[in-house]
Design a protein with these regions (language model features):
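Active-site gating/metal-coordination segments in enzymes
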Residues: 82, 86, 91-175, 227, ...
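Short acidic/histidine-rich active-site segments
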Residues: 177, 230-233, 257-278
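Divalent metal-coordination and catalytic microenvironments
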Residues: 22, 65, 169, 228, ...
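Histidine/acidic-residue-rich catalytic or RNA/ligand-binding cores of hydrolases
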Residues: 29-33, 77, 104-106, 186-194, ...
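Active-site beta-loop-alpha junctions enriched in small/polar residues
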Residues: 24-26, 70-71, 95-101, 150, ...
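Alpha-helical scaffold segments that flank or form the walls of functional sites
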Residues: 17-28, 34-91, 119-141
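Active-site gating loops and adjacent loop-to-helix segments of metal-dependent hydrolytic enzymes
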Residues: 23-48, 96-120, 141, 264-281
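Catalytic pocket-lining loop regions of alpha/beta-barrel enzymes
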Residues: 166, 170-250, 260
Length: 281
Protein backbone atom coordinates (compact mmCIF):
# COMPACT_ATOMS: atom_id res chain seq x y z
CA UNK A 1 0.00 0.00 0.00
CA UNK A 2 1.33 3.45 -0.92
CA UNK A 3 2.07 5.80 1.96
CA UNK A 4 2.02 9.57 2.36
CA UNK A 5 3.65 11.79 4.97
CA UNK A 6 1.40 13.52 7.49
CA UNK A 7 1.86 15.60 10.63
CA UNK A 8 1.51 12.44 12.74
CA UNK A 9 3.79 10.37 10.53
CA UNK A 10 3.41 8.25 7.39
CA UNK A 11 -0.02 6.81 6.70
CA UNK A 12 -1.42 4.43 4.09
CA UNK A 13 -3.27 6.28 1.35
CA UNK A 14 -6.21 3.95 2.00
CA UNK A 15 -6.60 5.70 5.36
CA UNK A 16 -7.09 9.17 3.88
CA UNK A 17 -10.87 8.87 3.65
CA UNK A 18 -12.93 12.01 3.02
CA UNK A 19 -10.36 14.68 2.19
CA UNK A 20 -10.47 18.46 1.89
CA UNK A 21 -7.78 19.41 -0.59
CA UNK A 22 -6.88 23.05 0.16
CA UNK A 23 -7.35 24.18 3.76
CA UNK A 24 -5.11 26.23 6.06
CA UNK A 25 -4.93 25.45 9.78
CA UNK A 26 -3.42 28.93 10.22
CA UNK A 27 -2.47 31.77 7.89
CA UNK A 28 -0.23 34.24 9.70
CA UNK A 29 2.21 37.09 9.15
CA UNK A 30 4.87 35.80 11.52
CA UNK A 31 6.88 39.00 12.00
CA UNK A 32 3.73 41.04 12.66
CA UNK A 33 2.54 38.42 15.12
CA UNK A 34 5.84 38.29 17.00
CA UNK A 35 6.26 42.06 17.21
CA UNK A 36 2.72 43.40 17.47
CA UNK A 37 0.47 40.47 18.33
CA UNK A 38 0.75 40.76 22.10
CA UNK A 39 -2.48 42.72 22.48
CA UNK A 40 -4.64 40.45 20.35
CA UNK A 41 -2.96 37.06 19.90
CA UNK A 42 -3.28 34.45 22.64
CA UNK A 43 -1.51 31.25 21.63
CA UNK A 44 -3.51 29.01 23.96
CA UNK A 45 -6.82 30.51 22.88
CA UNK A 46 -5.97 30.07 19.21
CA UNK A 47 -4.77 26.49 19.68
CA UNK A 48 -7.93 25.62 21.63
CA UNK A 49 -10.04 27.24 18.93
CA UNK A 50 -8.22 25.27 16.25
CA UNK A 51 -8.78 22.02 18.13
CA UNK A 52 -12.49 22.75 18.47
CA UNK A 53 -12.94 23.64 14.81
CA UNK A 54 -11.01 20.65 13.51
CA UNK A 55 -12.80 18.32 15.92
CA UNK A 56 -16.09 19.59 14.50
CA UNK A 57 -14.75 18.83 11.04
CA UNK A 58 -14.00 15.23 12.01
CA UNK A 59 -17.48 14.91 13.51
CA UNK A 60 -18.84 15.80 10.08
CA UNK A 61 -16.96 12.93 8.48
CA UNK A 62 -13.75 14.56 7.26
CA UNK A 63 -10.65 12.47 7.99
CA UNK A 64 -7.91 14.36 6.09
CA UNK A 65 -7.07 17.94 5.21
CA UNK A 66 -4.33 19.03 2.83
CA UNK A 67 -2.69 22.21 4.16
CA UNK A 68 -0.67 24.25 1.60
CA UNK A 69 0.66 26.72 4.19
CA UNK A 70 4.30 27.38 3.30
CA UNK A 71 6.92 30.08 3.84
CA UNK A 72 5.17 33.40 3.27
CA UNK A 73 1.95 32.20 4.90
CA UNK A 74 3.30 31.72 8.42
CA UNK A 75 4.00 27.99 8.41
CA UNK A 76 4.89 26.86 11.94
CA UNK A 77 4.66 23.10 12.28
CA UNK A 78 4.96 22.83 16.12
CA UNK A 79 1.65 24.71 16.48
CA UNK A 80 -0.04 22.41 13.99
CA UNK A 81 1.44 19.40 15.79
CA UNK A 82 -0.06 20.57 19.10
CA UNK A 83 -3.48 20.78 17.52
CA UNK A 84 -3.23 17.49 15.66
CA UNK A 85 -2.26 15.68 18.88
CA UNK A 86 -5.64 16.71 20.27
CA UNK A 87 -7.55 15.76 17.12
CA UNK A 88 -6.29 12.21 16.54
CA UNK A 89 -9.03 11.40 14.05
CA UNK A 90 -7.67 13.87 11.52
CA UNK A 91 -4.76 13.48 9.10
CA UNK A 92 -3.04 16.76 8.19
CA UNK A 93 -0.87 16.74 5.07
CA UNK A 94 1.59 19.66 4.88
CA UNK A 95 3.58 21.33 2.13
CA UNK A 96 6.87 22.95 1.29
CA UNK A 97 7.41 25.84 -1.07
CA UNK A 98 7.28 29.62 -1.03
CA UNK A 99 4.30 31.97 -1.29
CA UNK A 100 4.92 35.32 -2.95
CA UNK A 101 3.03 37.31 -5.56
CA UNK A 102 6.16 38.91 -7.05
CA UNK A 103 9.57 39.31 -5.42
CA UNK A 104 11.46 36.83 -3.29
CA UNK A 105 12.14 37.51 0.38
CA UNK A 106 15.47 39.36 0.58
CA UNK A 107 17.25 36.35 2.09
CA UNK A 108 16.70 34.44 -1.15
CA UNK A 109 16.70 37.46 -3.46
CA UNK A 110 20.33 38.21 -2.62
CA UNK A 111 21.51 34.59 -2.63
CA UNK A 112 21.76 32.22 -5.55
CA UNK A 113 23.03 32.24 -9.12
CA UNK A 114 23.12 35.73 -10.62
CA UNK A 115 22.38 37.52 -7.34
CA UNK A 116 24.49 39.98 -5.35
CA UNK A 117 25.97 37.30 -3.08
CA UNK A 118 25.93 34.55 -5.73
CA UNK A 119 26.16 30.98 -4.43
CA UNK A 120 24.11 27.88 -5.27
CA UNK A 121 20.34 27.79 -5.64
CA UNK A 122 19.00 27.41 -2.12
CA UNK A 123 15.30 26.98 -2.76
CA UNK A 124 15.29 23.49 -4.25
CA UNK A 125 17.70 22.22 -1.60
CA UNK A 126 15.45 23.51 1.18
CA UNK A 127 12.31 22.08 -0.43
CA UNK A 128 13.96 18.69 -0.89
CA UNK A 129 15.13 18.71 2.73
CA UNK A 130 11.58 19.43 3.95
CA UNK A 131 10.36 16.41 1.98
CA UNK A 132 13.12 13.93 2.78
CA UNK A 133 14.39 14.99 6.21
CA UNK A 134 11.48 16.87 7.74
CA UNK A 135 10.63 20.49 8.46
CA UNK A 136 12.73 22.52 10.92
CA UNK A 137 13.72 19.61 13.14
CA UNK A 138 10.13 18.52 13.82
CA UNK A 139 10.40 15.25 11.92
CA UNK A 140 7.23 16.20 10.02
CA UNK A 141 7.80 15.72 6.29
CA UNK A 142 6.19 17.74 3.54
CA UNK A 143 4.17 15.68 1.07
CA UNK A 144 3.67 18.21 -1.72
CA UNK A 145 4.91 21.50 -3.17
CA UNK A 146 3.29 24.94 -3.31
CA UNK A 147 4.07 28.00 -5.44
CA UNK A 148 2.22 30.99 -6.90
CA UNK A 149 1.66 32.55 -10.31
CA UNK A 150 -0.40 35.67 -9.68
CA UNK A 151 -1.60 38.74 -11.59
CA UNK A 152 1.90 40.00 -12.45
CA UNK A 153 2.65 36.71 -14.15
CA UNK A 154 6.03 35.01 -14.36
CA UNK A 155 8.15 37.69 -12.68
CA UNK A 156 11.81 36.83 -12.02
CA UNK A 157 11.03 35.95 -8.40
CA UNK A 158 7.97 33.87 -9.28
CA UNK A 159 9.87 32.08 -12.04
CA UNK A 160 12.73 31.21 -9.73
CA UNK A 161 10.39 29.66 -7.18
CA UNK A 162 8.48 27.78 -9.87
CA UNK A 163 11.66 26.35 -11.39
CA UNK A 164 12.86 25.30 -7.93
CA UNK A 165 9.50 23.61 -7.37
CA UNK A 166 9.83 21.84 -10.72
CA UNK A 167 13.36 20.69 -9.90
CA UNK A 168 12.17 19.37 -6.54
CA UNK A 169 9.31 17.53 -8.22
CA UNK A 170 11.71 15.88 -10.66
CA UNK A 171 13.95 14.83 -7.78
CA UNK A 172 11.26 13.59 -5.37
CA UNK A 173 8.15 12.90 -7.45
CA UNK A 174 5.85 14.73 -5.03
CA UNK A 175 2.86 16.60 -6.50
CA UNK A 176 2.51 20.36 -6.93
CA UNK A 177 -0.29 22.80 -6.17
CA UNK A 178 -0.13 26.29 -7.66
CA UNK A 179 -2.01 29.37 -6.49
CA UNK A 180 -3.21 30.93 -9.75
CA UNK A 181 -5.20 34.00 -10.75
CA UNK A 182 -8.09 32.89 -12.93
CA UNK A 183 -8.95 36.42 -14.10
CA UNK A 184 -5.49 36.70 -15.64
CA UNK A 185 -5.38 33.03 -16.75
CA UNK A 186 -2.08 32.41 -15.01
CA UNK A 187 -2.77 28.69 -14.84
CA UNK A 188 -1.63 28.63 -18.47
CA UNK A 189 1.69 30.24 -17.53
CA UNK A 190 2.22 27.69 -14.77
CA UNK A 191 1.56 24.75 -17.08
CA UNK A 192 3.82 26.20 -19.78
CA UNK A 193 6.75 26.46 -17.38
CA UNK A 194 6.17 23.08 -15.76
CA UNK A 195 5.83 21.34 -19.11
CA UNK A 196 9.12 22.89 -20.26
CA UNK A 197 10.74 21.78 -17.00
CA UNK A 198 9.67 18.16 -17.44
CA UNK A 199 7.03 18.10 -14.71
CA UNK A 200 4.42 15.33 -14.82
CA UNK A 201 1.32 17.48 -15.41
CA UNK A 202 -0.90 14.75 -13.99
CA UNK A 203 0.59 15.71 -10.62
CA UNK A 204 -0.26 19.42 -10.82
CA UNK A 205 -3.27 21.09 -9.19
CA UNK A 206 -4.11 24.58 -10.45
CA UNK A 207 -5.50 26.28 -7.38
CA UNK A 208 -8.38 28.78 -7.50
CA UNK A 209 -9.09 28.18 -11.18
CA UNK A 210 -12.73 27.87 -10.19
CA UNK A 211 -12.77 31.60 -9.46
CA UNK A 212 -13.47 31.94 -13.18
CA UNK A 213 -16.72 31.33 -15.05
CA UNK A 214 -14.80 31.19 -18.35
CA UNK A 215 -15.38 27.59 -19.33
CA UNK A 216 -13.09 27.82 -22.35
CA UNK A 217 -10.18 28.75 -20.10
CA UNK A 218 -11.01 25.92 -17.71
CA UNK A 219 -11.31 23.42 -20.56
CA UNK A 220 -7.96 24.50 -22.00
CA UNK A 221 -6.34 23.82 -18.65
CA UNK A 222 -7.91 20.41 -18.22
CA UNK A 223 -7.24 19.35 -21.80
CA UNK A 224 -3.52 19.63 -21.07
CA UNK A 225 -3.66 16.69 -18.72
CA UNK A 226 -3.91 17.58 -15.03
CA UNK A 227 -6.40 15.11 -13.54
CA UNK A 228 -7.06 17.50 -10.68
CA UNK A 229 -7.46 20.60 -12.74
CA UNK A 230 -8.74 23.17 -10.30
CA UNK A 231 -9.50 23.96 -6.73
CA UNK A 232 -12.14 26.50 -5.88
CA UNK A 233 -13.60 27.99 -2.77
CA UNK A 234 -17.03 28.33 -4.34
CA UNK A 235 -16.54 32.09 -4.44
CA UNK A 236 -15.09 34.42 -6.99
CA UNK A 237 -12.80 37.25 -5.99
CA UNK A 238 -10.99 37.50 -9.33
CA UNK A 239 -14.09 38.40 -11.35
CA UNK A 240 -16.48 39.87 -8.77
CA UNK A 241 -19.12 42.54 -9.01
CA UNK A 242 -17.85 45.89 -7.75
CA UNK A 243 -19.52 45.35 -4.39
CA UNK A 244 -17.33 42.40 -3.45
CA UNK A 245 -17.43 38.62 -3.27
CA UNK A 246 -20.29 36.47 -4.47
CA UNK A 247 -21.03 32.74 -4.81
CA UNK A 248 -19.67 31.37 -8.07
CA UNK A 249 -21.40 28.08 -8.94
CA UNK A 250 -21.87 28.98 -12.61
CA UNK A 251 -18.74 27.20 -13.81
CA UNK A 252 -19.75 24.10 -11.86
CA UNK A 253 -23.31 24.03 -13.18
CA UNK A 254 -22.18 24.49 -16.77
CA UNK A 255 -19.12 22.27 -16.71
CA UNK A 256 -20.45 19.29 -14.80
CA UNK A 257 -22.73 17.81 -17.51
CA UNK A 258 -19.81 17.62 -19.96
CA UNK A 259 -16.91 17.13 -17.59
CA UNK A 260 -17.36 13.76 -15.93
CA UNK A 261 -14.02 12.66 -17.39
CA UNK A 262 -12.27 15.67 -15.78
CA UNK A 263 -11.54 14.90 -12.13
CA UNK A 264 -11.83 18.11 -10.14
CA UNK A 265 -11.38 19.28 -6.56
CA UNK A 266 -13.75 21.63 -4.78
CA UNK A 267 -12.25 22.43 -1.38
CA UNK A 268 -13.26 25.24 0.94
CA UNK A 269 -9.97 27.18 1.17
CA UNK A 270 -10.62 27.66 4.87
CA UNK A 271 -8.51 28.55 7.91
CA UNK A 272 -9.12 28.29 11.65
CA UNK A 273 -7.44 31.69 12.08
CA UNK A 274 -5.83 34.26 9.81
CA UNK A 275 -4.12 35.93 12.75
CA UNK A 276 -5.85 39.28 12.36
CA UNK A 277 -6.25 41.76 15.21
CA UNK A 278 -9.83 42.33 16.36
CA UNK A 279 -11.77 45.11 14.65
CA UNK A 280 -11.99 48.30 16.69
CA UNK A 281 -14.76 49.94 14.72
Amino acid sequence: MAQIASVRGPIDTAELGSTLMHEHVFVLSTEILENYGGDWWDEEVRVTDGVQKLTALVERGITTIVDPTVIGLGRYIPRVQRINEQVPGLNIIVATGLYTFDELPHYFGYRGPGTLLEGPELLADLFISDIRDGIAGTGVKAAFLKCVVEEKGMTPGIERVARAVAATHRETGVPITVHTNAAHETGTLALDLFEAEGVDLTKVVLGHSGDSNDLEYLRRLMDRGPPSAWTASGWTCSTPPPSGWRPSPLWLRRATPTAWSWPTMRPVTWTTSAGQPPRTS
